[in-house]
Amino acid sequence: MHPRFQTAFAQLADNLQSALAPILADHHFPAMLAAEQVSTLKNATGLDEDALAFALLPLAAACARTDLSHFNVGAIARGVSGNWYFGANMEFLGATMQQTVHAEQSAISHAWLCGEKGLAAVTVNYTPCGHCRQFMNELNSGLDLRIHLPGRAPHTLRDYLPDAFGPKDLEIKTLLMDEQDHGFALTGDTLTQAAITAANKSHMPYSQSPSGVALECKDGRIFTGSYAENAAFNPTLPPLQGALNLLSLNGYDYPDIQRAILAEKGDAALIQWDATAATLKALGCHNIDRVLLG
């Protein structure tokens, strides 16, 4: 078990501990539960889905990287597939506050980058900030997405974001988590192709500026992130954050990164290179390359 889970795990009910122990045994537990595992945990504990999600929130929050705020937020995105995806907030010392990943963004990006096609609900241990409410409004689940908070009845995003502004106001039809493939040819080595594949998945209807990042760890594991734009612009999630989020959720740390590649168009309206390189260098990675899409 990864050390970050030990304190939260010890506070769980005995029957939940027993059912979770074999799942968490892997140091690189991917911070997600397949639908079959969710069913196993429900049967072992007698908890319904909502109660189980609340019980697991401390494990999600244990994934937080909060060197600045020391305020851990955990979220669980429940996919329409039945799979559950953990998320937690991330802060990056030496970078800028704008690079921060919120817990809801973390869980949603986690689900999206794992191939989930839509979300049924998000469970979170603190009320979503305005930034996250706007981020969630980009999803193909729309304002019907259910949000679950401890001690409160479940509500929809519509309740938390009244008079919402979103992609439909800008006549955008393809939404975040809809399947997209921008068709850029795969070239180069495995890591380069992974970055291009991530760029092909980008949700960028406002700038038409696709981008993707691939991070290679010292053990050969590769994590990718795709660019996810938002109708309100500022809640947009850069591709590097998506990749770093997956890396961290899978139990890796920044010193494990040995190489990084950004894929983007050289003449795009928005360029990720400077911000990507600056953040990676702040985290100790200097082996950074850029491949141009075309």
From Swiss-Prot:
Active site annotation, chain numbering: 104 (proton donor)
Residue sites binding substrate per the record: 89-91
Single Gene Ontology MF annotation: cytidine deaminase activity
Recorded superkingdom: Bacteria
Keywords: Hydrolase, Metal-binding, Zinc
Any one of the GO CC terms: cytosol
GO biological process: cytidine deamination
Lipoprotein listed as a keyword: no
Enzyme class: hydrolase
Requisite cofactors: Zn(2+)
Sites where the protein binds Zn(2+): 102, 129, 132
Cofactor annotation remark: Binds 1 zinc ion.
EC numbers: 3.5.4.5
All residue ranges annotated as the CMP/dCMP-type deaminase domain in the record: 48-168, 186-294
PROSITE patterns per UniProt: CYT_DCMP_DEAMINASES_1, CYT_DCMP_DEAMINASES_2
HAMAP family for the chain: Cyt_deam
Function (record text): This enzyme scavenges exogenous and endogenous cytidine and 2'-deoxycytidine for UMP synthesis.
Assembly with partners or alone: Homodimer.
Protein name: Cytidine deaminase
Organism of this sequence: Salmonella arizonae (strain ATCC BAA-731 / CDC346-86 / RSK2980)
